């Protein structure tokens, strides 16, 4: 089972296309939708949804995949549920770069302060990070510098921020899921 978390643009038709692409790895891909506007509510909602989905699968190695803001949640929700995660162009600092886009961006700081301290050290090796060199939204070198001590970093030379075509990364994601 693959749990897929969309980015900030929840209604993008690209989400459906990514789900179709991920079905080449696992036929059971489930979209977990969330508001993107209310971080504390989103966190509780996602924790409940993941817990529910885990009870409904017999997959011994489910993973959670998120793009952009979904990558922020995939890392945290994956850690809290003991799941491997794939972070595609993750938004590491929504409290800084979501100002004016969501109602309460400061809630992200509050979530970070309440999270398990040093969770990345405890989650080391359990996330795969895929970064676009052509990301038009984030400076992914900064993301790489932040995460490379904990997770494998894979660079993509072609895709933009929303990563519409996963094809070149599917074998890597599949190996990570099974490994």
Curated annotation (Swiss-Prot):
* Xref: SUPFAM superfamilies: alpha/beta-Hydrolases
Q: Please, which domain of life does this record's source organism belong to?
A: Bacteria
The record's listing under InterPro entries reads: AB_hydrolase_fold (IPR029058), UPF0227 (IPR022987), UPF0227/Esterase_YqiA (IPR008886)
Q: Which Pfam families match?
A: UPF0227
Family in the record: Belongs to the UPF0227 family.
User: Can you say what this protein is called?
Assistant: UPF0227 protein Swoo_1808
Q: Which organism is it from?
A: Shewanella woodyi (strain ATCC 51908 / MS32)
């Amino acid at each position: 089972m693959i749990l897929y978390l969309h980015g900030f643009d929840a209604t993008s038709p690209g989400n459906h296309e990514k789900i179709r692409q991920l079905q080449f790895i696992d036929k059971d891909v489930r979209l977990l939708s969330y508001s993107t506007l209310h971080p504390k509510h989103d966190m509780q909602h996602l924790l409940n949804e993941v817990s529910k989905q885990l009870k409904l699968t017999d997959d011994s190695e489910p993973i959670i995949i998120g793009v952009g803001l979904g990558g922020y949640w995939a890392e945290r929700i994956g850690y809290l549920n003991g799941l491997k995660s794939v972070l595609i162009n993750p938004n590491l600092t929504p409290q800084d770069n979501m100002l004016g886009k969501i109602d309460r961006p400061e809630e992200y700081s509050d979530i970070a302060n309440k999270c398990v301290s040093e969770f990345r050290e405890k989650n080391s090796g359990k996330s795969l990070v895929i970064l676009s060199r052509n990301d038009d939204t984030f400076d992914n070198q900064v993301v790489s510098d932040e995460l490379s001590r904990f997770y494998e970093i894979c660079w993509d030379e072609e895709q933009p921020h929303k990563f519409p075509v996963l094809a070149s990364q599917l074998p890597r994601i599949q190996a990570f899921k099974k490994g």
